[in-house]
Amino acid sequence: MKRGLAVRLAGLALLAATIAGCTGVRVPKAWEPLLEEVRAFEQRIGFRKTATFVEFSEEQGRIPFCGHVSRLYLPYSYEDPAILWYDVATERECRAHADGADVYFGTVEVLGESGAAVSPEVLAVQLQRFLYLVIHEDCHEQFEFPYGIEEALCNLIAYKAMAAFSEEKYGAQAREYIAIQRYTSRESERTRAIRTLYEQLAGHYARYERKEISDDALLKERARVFGRAERALAWKRGSLNNVGIANEMTYSRHYPLLESVYDALGRDLARTVAFFRRVDAIKPSQGEVMKEHDIASKDSLDFIRSYEADIARTIETALAGATRR
């Protein structure tokens, strides 16, 4: 399995877990008209047509993923090269060669790439999950940002689009709208909580790297932070580990910046999509980033960090220009 696909699968599973805990309604049996309505809405906000979810497949099935990372290392994001992704079918296989590392195993109902089909697994989810999958995956086909930017951007667009679409289609009093609105409104709070959690962990890992605390002391501090987070966010006890938090942070790190763009542009989805198309066109190339920062490999963590940071600065500069007009 390609590394990029593996990490996208893990990211999709992460969002599935949060949606699964929400009260909602099922996807209607007549799902094709709903999908057509979503696609029409997408085009109104500036999306181009995509090759995702254009066919139905009985054979696709759920897709497994498996990631490992040392408990003594806090990854930057799901792209961090320290996370090892494996092509295995079961959790038992995933854990068999973990050798004490954190293990992140799960399955998702769809491949996170262009050409994914609608399957029985996709149609068996709650309405929130269906709308999320369609809009988020279609969003990825609109831009060519690094995942650390694009995952957060496509979450932002998906959440705002889900709320707007459901209000148009169902009305503000409908249970579908209320369930979707409740879910999307919780996301900014959850994002802030994830960022705070990660910063707390990063402080402990920085002390460990400076040799101020031992392995055991680090892991005890980590357990305390994870325990508080699981209680605050109503997650299953023991569900968090370093691969999981790296996945979470991929979606959370730049979300506040991107949401500030949406707010500055009048909370207008079409303007927001158009703005990020312009940023996509003027962003620094990978080669320019490598040259500026004297980085030898685009697979390195230095490159991942630098590329995201340079694009974040491009966004801030472009927004300043756009709001002066």
Regions found by a protein language model. Give the residues of each.
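Bacterial N-terminal signal peptides that target proteins for export
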Residues: 1-10
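Residue-level marker of regulatory loop/turn positions in helix-turn-helix DNA-binding domains and
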Residues: 7, 127, 250
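Bacterial N-terminal signal peptides
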Residues: 10-18
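Polybasic, low-complexity, intrinsically disordered segments
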Residues: 19-20, 160
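N-terminal mature-domain "stem" immediately C-terminal to a signal peptide or N-terminal signal-anchor/transmembrane
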Residues: 23-83, 267, 299-322
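Acidic/histidine-rich, surface-exposed loop or edge segments in extracytoplasmic proteins
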Residues: 25, 135, 142, 238-240
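Acidic/His-rich structured neighborhood in mature extracellular/periplasmic domains
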Residues: 49-190, 194, 199
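Pan-zinc metallopeptidase signature
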Residues: 196-325
